[in-house]
Amino acid sequence: HQHTGNWAGKTVANAVGTCEAHGCQLTLVDLPGTYSLRAHSAEEAVARDFLCLEQPDAVVFVCDVSCLARNLNLVLQGMELARRVLVCVNLLDEGEKKGISVDLPALEACLGVPVIGMSARSKQGLEELLERLCTQLQAESVPLPKVVAYDPDLERAVCKLLPPIQAQQPVGIRARWAALRMLEEDAALLQKLSDRQLLNLEAPDLQDAWEEARALLASSNAPPVADRMIAAIVTESRELAEEVVQEP
């Protein structure tokens, strides 16, 4: 048994446990609680680095029903990176006391990934979570999750980077996610990807495309790339929550 929590700052180190369910031997890693993968804090950096460098087989995002919009910021960022994603909407019992409910099937349809409602304290929903997790793990392939659409200039810059990234056939990281990290010039993360030989940033075709993408973005006279990404994700999260959450 591990004592963990799903609020930001609760877990300060990774807690690891194992269990067997539905024919799967699972190793579960509880990452530091965070609302973002932007690596502005130690918790965010640990969570982000684990997801992109350790490449888990699946990622379960545990959300609080009472602040779903804020939690969806993290979910949408994570879905750009991970290939197998499940979303757990927790504390349904507490939400019910406050008059809060979530249309779980609608949220699942919007995100394109399994969504499970839970009240972890009473273990309500735990069996469904394990069953759907194992189904994902045993499937040869799963549909890719929803992609956040950014502004047209940013999307054009991404399109310039995708062919040379895909030509490298990077293992364990998604080409679109790598392109976005290059566009926001996340030097520390890009160095880690290079050190792990997950992406060859010095490849001539990639360098040429990167320069073209930079020039395109510089000519648009828009806010910094990271700010544009965050704004799009926050807007998408808010609109999703407004669509599926009912509250007094």
Please describe what each predicted stretch is.
Residues 8, 12, 24-27, 39, ...:
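Helical mechanochemical/support elements of P-loop NTPase systems and associated helical scaffolds
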Residues 30, 90, 119:
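Active-site glycine-centered loops adjacent to acidic/histidine catalytic or metal-binding residues
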